[in-house]
Amino acid sequence: MSKNNKTTEPTAPQALTAQFSEQIIDERLTPNPLSQFSMDKDALRLALVTAQYALRATRQQTPPILNKPTGLLVLVNGMEQAGKGTAVKQLRQWVDPRLLKVEATVGDCPLAYQPIWQAHTKALPRHGDVMVYFGNWYADLLYNVMRMATSDNDNANVNANDNVNDNVNDNKEQSKNLKSKSTKSDNDKALPIAQWQAYLQQQLIKLQAFEQDLAANQTRLLKCWFHVDIETLQARLNDDEADPQFLYQIDWNSKKVIETFNQVATVLLRQQDDWIIIDGDNKSDAADHFCHEVLQAMQTALMSSKKNTVNTSDKSKAKKQAQQALKSAKFEPVKIPKCLKNIDDAEIDKSEYRDALVEKQVRLAQLLRARKGRHIVFAFEGMDAAGKGGAIKRLVAPLDPRDYQIYNISAPMLYELQHPYLWRFWTKLPNEQTDRISRIAIFDRTWYGRVLVERIEGFATDEEWQRAYDEINRFEADLAAAGTIVIKYWLAIDKKEQLKRFEARQETPHKQFKLTDDDWRNRDKWSDYVQSAADMLARTDTEYAPWCVIATNEKRQARLDVLDHAIKQLSAVCGS
């Protein structure tokens, strides 16, 4: 099976100069929009609350409308004392505060074994809502980068008493900071590429991809970077009481720290051109500017919501779309591999099975203990009655029940549909903040439903499920890059054996609950599911998250094969 590795390669880092370039901020600073347009504050306030209610109203909950409203996530970052709090306070006063969600972080060390964005996904707004998020994943990133950058410097131990006030006169030009253009000296020597710079650029590539996936799934982002010059910053720091929770947990009184932060900000803003930079020297003007940017973003989200509202009352049209999916000019189905057609049904002796099962379960438990806290995600997919539940039962038998969580994935709930598609899986991943013990997640059906049942039943558009292959690959690549072990299974069964198991379930009272009308309906579309599975395996079998196809006509052997593959994967990572 071919391996897909479509992760974006980072561009070569650019060396920073010894003299901090102020041009990036200066060129990107935008004037207060209220000075450009004939909109006073009263008009802006009315427009904001009107747009807020109009956006909320797009979130329809009744059929037959397939409604895909857009949510708005406002990321607020930048310098300390730059007017961020004042701006968000004004926004909340001008809109209906009950409908505006606000979250805040100051930045902390990214959690072990999970992508930098993962800890923040539960806070994402529902479609049709607006949320302001201070700090967010960029605060965690900047916190980590600043720690690396200060340790990279020759003077790693920054003198906390090296106050900006001591050097204001000597640094008059730099005190104007980031708003007046500076000319680089011909003798200005380039610094070598620092470790923190390469790390930052790599993380920004991943975050940009994550944010693009959010936008493609009806969550629009507005990214606002608040900037203030050094003299104003120092004056505000002197006026306010000391804050033990300074943004990014750095000492904003230190000249060296600010110089380092400016270098970090330069790399970030060079690489990402979607930040709105707001001049925070005048807090009132900054608040007006911020509110205007939020208004424009809400209006754009509103237009997107209306565009995405599709009338699906004509069921025959939706069915026809699903039938024509395989004929899409943008998508070429793959040839169905033998492992999905020729299912091995070799039997194993019952006593031999029991001995092997115990041996493999003991070995699996040893490897899981040796993984030293690394997160593990087991993903089970397969045809109905292929034995996912039985395989999972044997997989967890040797484990402490506190060590793992099992998620039985079915049709999404309404609130889950009001978030990006992958959101309901992001929020179930092992989390260092909440999962003190259970850092193993086992999914009985997974995020691959988008390219299986949703594709076949027409619950996702052609564009959505075809795009999902790359989205899923990026998701799993981020998990693997963070140190999470991803183990994926496709349990293969033939049509004859499936019918045999369906009939057995019908005749067994304590198993009748396992058989539903959907199971029979899915069976009628057997060939569609086999083709979709083949396409899925071909497009999402990667080096960092490979598929393992298990023949399950013979249940006992299948359960042993599931354990064998887990042992093999964990041995490669944790040692033999």
Listing of model-derived features with the role each one plays in the protein:
Residues 2-576:
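Glycine-rich phosphate-binding loop of ATP-dependent small-molecule kinases
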